[in-house]
Amino acid sequence: GRNMKQNTVVIGLTGQTGAGKSTVGESLLRRGAAWVDADLIAHDVADNEKVCLADLALEFTIDILNVDGTLNRKKLADIVFHDKAKLRRLNEIIFPYIIRAIEAELARLRAEGHHYIVLDAPTLFESGCDRYCDVIISVVADEQLRLQRILGRDGLTHEEAEARIQAQHRESYYVRRSDFVIENNDTVDTLCLKVAEVMSRIETGERPRQQRQAEEAQQEARH
């Protein structure tokens, strides 16, 4: 009989701010996918990983810790916010801990035998988390729509919202790096239909990214 454990498929989920990533995520959850939230893990690491906190205190002085030894986020933010080099240092220190925690969580969920695990990471590619993913779905939308959505959602001024949009990658960035790009310029119903279509393509084993890489490698070999 089927004593083979069904394969786990890790789905990377990323995209532009305000494009509708969370709606796509909810749709995947309803299909029974397990969930790994990279931002939540990053938060958790900074709060609970004692060795990481010690590393941070060594770099940015003891001022960044509260009396009880927990992280004072406000203090840390004040230090790194206006200083690119310090922000880079912060990321360098905390990064290995986050990656380890994500790896551990993926391993735990694999062992539980989940068919789908969604790795939700706004900076999926920058962080190198794409290497844990069997397939990657990116959610994109027209700039004006994203602007309206984050204005309505995050209580930002128009300037702040504009700045946040400008800091985002263009659609082409995601197209080059993803298996499936979902455009969300329409209703939620349309979006859910697109998710259903993508999921059935994933089910049947479509892996556009791998195919592209294989084709590129072949072309390299020819030259």
Residue ranges and their predicted role:
Residues 103-111, 115-152:
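ATP-dependent NMP and nucleoside kinases share a basic, alpha-helical "lid"
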Residues 98, 102, 131-132, 152, ...:
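Small-molecule kinase domains that catalyze NTP-dependent phosphoryl transfer to phosphate-bearing small molecules
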Residues 22:
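Walker A/P-loop
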Residues 19:
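ATP-binding Walker
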Residues 16, 28:
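P-loop (Walker A) phosphate-binding loop of NTP-binding proteins
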Residues 13:
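Hydrophobic anchor at the beta1->P-loop junction of P-loop NTPases
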Residues 43-115:
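ATP-dependent small-molecule kinase phosphotransfer cores
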